[in-house]
């Protein structure tokens, strides 16, 4: 496989074929919590993409100099430093969104996607491939968040990115918002539906029966 094809596979593979949420079922907790609005879903997706990509890059660059006995500590230190930078930038330039995301930006430190890619991929792969892998997994994570956020905000509040799309009865319109979709459990069911749809069209992702 040529370098260009391999880079493309690393970048696009996690979006559908190896999606971190839909196939690997990682990072679900934040997906439940931040998808009631598209705005927060988008910002969370961008934050995780940035942290995953740059943590992969930095860890890959020093992978041959990290003692095996302390590799997890080194990985978490790099990831935590990047999360602090992202959190401070959000507080400085998008304070209201930062308040809405609350602790979930900080919890990127413990996100299974970030830690998993650092340990399983960046520690064994050159920097550029690791960087693209981080972006690809961030895009895969973001695709699920945006799909869930789209449904939850549109039918739960009648809006997208805070702009009214479905005119609500309370404002003299026709649409009665479904408040259930604004509750975290609804995201769990929507993610389940997305997994079902993906595995229906890609049966190779269905787990083999024991």
Curated annotation (Swiss-Prot):
Reaction(s) the record says it catalyses: a ubiquinone + n Na(+)(in) + NADH + H(+) = a ubiquinol + n Na(+)(out) + NAD(+)
Biological-process GO terms, alphabetical: sodium ion transport
EC number assigned by the record: 7.2.1.1
Pfam families (alphabetical): Rnf-Nqr (PF02508)
Top EC class, one word: translocase
Localization of this protein: Cell inner membrane
Membrane topology: Multi-pass membrane protein
InterPro entries: NqrD, NqrDE/RnfAE
GO CC term, one of those recorded: plasma membrane
GO molecular function, one term: oxidoreductase activity, acting on NAD(P)H, quinone or similar compound as acceptor
The UniProt record lists the keyword Nucleotide-binding: no
Residue spans crossing the bilayer: 14-34, 42-62, 72-92, 103-123, 131-151, 178-198
Family: Belongs to the NqrDE/RnfAE family.
Subunit annotation: Composed of six subunits; NqrA, NqrB, NqrC, NqrD, NqrE and NqrF.
NCBIfam families in alphabetical order: nqrD, PRK09292.1, PRK12405.1
Task of the protein: NQR complex catalyzes the reduction of ubiquinone-1 to ubiquinol by two successive reactions, coupled with the transport of Na(+) ions from the cytoplasm to the periplasm. NqrA to NqrE are probably involved in the second step, the conversion of ubisemiquinone to ubiquinol.
Protein name (database record): Na(+)-translocating NADH-quinone reductase subunit D
Organism: Shewanella baltica (strain OS155 / ATCC BAA-1091)
Lineage, broadest ranks: Bacteria, Pseudomonadati, Pseudomonadota, Gammaproteobacteria, Alteromonadales
Gene responsible for this protein: nqrD
């Amino acid at each position: 496989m040529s370098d260009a094809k391999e880079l493309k596979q690393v970048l696009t593979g996690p979006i559908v074929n190896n999606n971190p949420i839909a196939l690997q079922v990682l990072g679900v907790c934040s997906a439940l919590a931040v998808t009631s609005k598209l705005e927060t879903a988008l910002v969370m997706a961008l934050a995780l993409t940035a942290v995953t990509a740059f943590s992969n890059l930095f860890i890959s660059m020093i992978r041959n100099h990290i003692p095996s006995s302390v590799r997890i500590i080194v990985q978490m230190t790099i990831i935590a430093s990047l999360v602090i930078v992202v959190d401070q930038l959000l507080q400085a330039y998008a304070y209201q969104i930062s308040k809405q995301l609350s602790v979930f930006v900080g919890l990127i430190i413990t996100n299974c996607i970030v830690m998993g890619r650092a340990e399983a991929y960046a520690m064994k792969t050159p920097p550029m491939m690791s960087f693209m892998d981080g972006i690809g997994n961030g895009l895969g994570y973001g695709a699920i968040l945006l799909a869930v956020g789209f449904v939850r905000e549109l039918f739960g509040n009648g809006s997208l990115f805070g702009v009214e799309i479905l005119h609500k009865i309370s404002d003299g319109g026709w649409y009665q918002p479904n408040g259930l979709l604004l509750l975290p459990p609804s995201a769990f069911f929507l993610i389940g539906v997305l997994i079902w749809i993906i595995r229906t069209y890609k049966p190779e992702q269905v787990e083999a029966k024991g």
